[in-house]
Amino acid sequence: VSAADKALYCQGCFHCWVKTPGECSYKDRLQKIGSRLAQCEEIVLLSRCCYGAFSPEVKRVLDRSIAVSLPFFTYRGGEIHHMLRYKNHPKMTVCFYGEITDFEKKTAQDIAERNCVNYGFQNLRLYFAEEAAGVKEVLFA
């Protein structure tokens, strides 16, 4: 899934949890992103690092992916999290690129770790590259 293509922002209506379970009510290319992610073996996120976080485009895709969870809560790792809708738990690889300070790297690491837990992904691998062109070398070194 490319975050570069235009897609609507999550409106926070939670229809994907209760009205149209597992599907966003927006009828665009991200409508079934939750179930599509659940079918993957590995999720690879490539993002420009924006103040220690995902770019707005990648964040939009992540926000629209909340259908991977349910509106109910459970304990995981001693914390309360939403229950997961799907049994498959893909691996997660994140590569941030750009001029990134040490503080931004720490923030990006924290965000990636929390997203990994919240979305039910596993085995986080985190990389940093100076520019987008360097991502390939970092991921396939």
Language-model regions: role of each:
Residues 1-47, 51-70, 117, 125-141:
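N-terminal beta1-alpha1-beta2 submodule of the flavodoxin-like/Rossmannoid cofactor-binding fold
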Residues 70-118, 122:
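Short, glycine-/small-residue-rich phosphate/pyrophosphate-handling segment
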